[in-house]
């Protein structure tokens, strides 16, 4: 990782540590020879430490979030592998979404796509992103936050609008998102990408479906149901071909001149 001057941040942090060491050495020498410090000297030292902290803390924070993003991406890669194997076993069909749709946020939770895919990997599929700090995890009701990740609702055979597109119906599997990170507005285990082509109208799929509609932020022209900036301005996505990658949201859709935004990577029928 590099700073704005192109120098590795690890070296930058090391230089900061050396500088702090020099300041500390000077302070100890001053204390031994004079037996004390003046108020101005103490204020100067405090100011130097505050400046260094202001410089280094953002670097440490970014490094911590980068580590969380990598851990989340590892989760996504495992999901991609599991989904790809599931599709091969089920005649190119995709996993079901059987959470609490149509019954409200507190309705009984079905097995869901994560449990359907679990047998295809040796390790436990981790359903929570390290950076997902949604308060819904701690509200005492596990049904209100099923996972940090949602399945693209274009694919499952139990969900509109296509009612079960198969792998053969996906024009470009390497460019079609099947799993995205969910925001607080989606306690369910999937998101409805169908609404993304028209932010002024969100389709409804029955009672209780408002928990996972792809609602739009009219001011920003972007969805509020998917966590599009969870990791340093972007998020991790799983694609139909099984690979997972970090992207900024604007890389996952396209604006058609003279018309509203149209679905790009989220629609399996797009050319």
PLM feature spans:
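N-terminal leader/signal peptides at the extreme start of proteins
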Residues: 1-37
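Intrinsically disordered, low-complexity regions enriched in polar/acidic and amide residues
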Residues: 1-4, 61, 77
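Aromatic-residue hotspot detector
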Residues: 12, 19, 37, 57-60, ...
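Amphipathic alpha-helical segments typified by the pilin-like N-terminal helix
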Residues: 34-74
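Short, well-structured segments within or immediately adjacent to enzyme catalytic domains
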Residues: 72-271
């Amino acid at each position: 990782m590099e700073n704005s001057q192109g120098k590795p941040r690890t070296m930058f942090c090391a230089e900061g540590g050396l500088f702090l060491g020099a300041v500390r050495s000077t302070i100890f020498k001053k204390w031994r020879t004079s037996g004390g410090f003046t108020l101005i000297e103490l204020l100067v030292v405090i100011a130097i430490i505050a400046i260094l902290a202001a410089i280094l803390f953002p670097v440490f924070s970014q490094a911590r979030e980068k580590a969380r993003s990598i851990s989340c991406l590892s989760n996504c890669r495992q999901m991609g592998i599991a989904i790809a194997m599931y599709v091969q076993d089920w005649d190119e069909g995709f996993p079901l979404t059987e959470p609490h749709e149509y019954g409200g946020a507190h309705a009984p939770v079905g097995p869901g796509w994560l449990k359907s895919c679990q047998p295809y990997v040796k390790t436990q599929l981790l359903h929570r992103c390290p950076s997902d700090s949604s308060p819904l995890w701690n509200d005492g009701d596990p049904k209100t936050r099923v996972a940090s990740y949602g399945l693209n609702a274009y694919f499952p055979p139990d969900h509109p609008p296509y009612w079960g597109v198969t792998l053969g119906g996906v024009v470009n599997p390497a460019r079609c998102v099947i799993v995205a990170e969910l925001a607080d507005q989606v306690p369910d285990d999937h998101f409805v990408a169908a609404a993304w082509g028209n932010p002024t109208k969100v389709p409804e799929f029955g009672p209780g479906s408002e928990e996972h509609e792809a609602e739009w932020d009219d001011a920003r022209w972007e969805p509020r149901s998917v966590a599009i900036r969870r990791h340093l301005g972007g998020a991790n996505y799983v694609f139909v071909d099984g690979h997972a990658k970090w992207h900024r949201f604007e890389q996952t859709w396209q604006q058609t001149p003279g018309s509203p935004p149209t679905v790009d990577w989220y629609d399996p029928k797009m050319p």
